[in-house]
């Protein structure tokens, strides 16, 4: 399987600043794994949108996949209680 390239939406950098450092390391590791498998076990396609989400502790990572370009765009990172608002 080909490796996907990871890109971040500009607003994700603001989301990252809100995440505690201990959780941030785990989130970054989880995002890096998306390059090898953008649809890992436990990922879920969001209803009505071309977005996927993966869980990392109490945080959710929302992203889109472009299979033709082999890219993954991280759209949003946030706490599970706030991410879908």
Regions found by a protein language model. Give the residues of each.
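Enriched for short, Lys/Arg-rich terminal
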Residues: 1-25, 40, 56, 64-85
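A short, surface-exposed loop/turn module that caps and links secondary-structure elements
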Residues: 29-54
């Amino acid at each position: 399987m080909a490796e996907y390239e990871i890109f971040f939406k500009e607003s994700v950098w603001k989301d990252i600043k809100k995440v505690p450092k201990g959780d941030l390391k785990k989130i970054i590791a989880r995002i890096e794994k998306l390059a090898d498998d953008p649809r890992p076990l436990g990922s879920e396609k969001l209803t009505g949108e071309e977005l996927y989400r993966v869980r990392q502790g109490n945080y959710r990572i929302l992203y889109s996949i472009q299979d033709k370009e082999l890219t993954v765009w991280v759209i949003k990172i946030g706490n599970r209680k706030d991410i879908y608002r």
